[in-house]
A protein has these predicted regions:
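Polar low-complexity intrinsically disordered regions
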Residues: 1, 26-27, 62
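Bacterial N-terminal signal peptides that target proteins for export
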Residues: 1-15
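Central antiparallel beta-sheet cores of small beta-barrel/beta-sandwich binding domains
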Residues: 30-139
């Protein structure tokens, strides 16, 4: 059970980081002005399918992949352990990005949504197994 919880936590944490980083653009035309490239960090919480919650911290690196997309790699940690994940985010309008994430170690994937407000990002992550996470990242 703990092994599964750690895998889900890791996937959710990475997804949150990715989502937070992707939402920094307000519009494709403004992408250069609000570039997500570089390092972001912050914290939030992870909810497991069992209903248990844990605080978590994440560090994410964003690399522009196209006019409206970013590749993200993230490391997150909680009381359950540490995890590394990757994600691809696409601009969807306004100040939001959405995409998918994947944790290679635990073979966990899911969706991520990032909303940008100034120098902060709000990230929301979910997995088909019922895990979720929310994070706030800053530069």
């Amino acid at each position: 059970m703990r092994f599964l919880a750690v895998g889900l936590l890791r996937s959710v944490c990475l997804m949150a980081v990715v989502a937070l980083g992707a939402s920094a653009s307000v519009a494709p035309a403004a992408a250069d002005m609000m570039a997500l490239d570089g390092a972001w960090s912050g914290g939030g919480s992870v909810k497991f399918p069992s209903g248990a919650k844990e605080a978590a911290r994440c560090r994410a690196n964003f690399k522009k992949r196209g006019a409206e997309s970013y590749q993200v790699s993230a490391r997150c940690a909680s009381a359950s352990g540490k995890v590394e994940q990757s994600a691809l985010l696409t601009y969807v309008g306004g100040n939001q990005f959405t995409g998918s994430f994947f944790n290679e170690e635990y073979k966990v994937d899911g969706t991520i949504t990032v909303t940008v407000s100034g120098n902060a990002q709000s990230v929301s992550i979910s997995t088909p197994a019922g895990s979720s996470a929310t994070f706030k990242l800053t530069r």
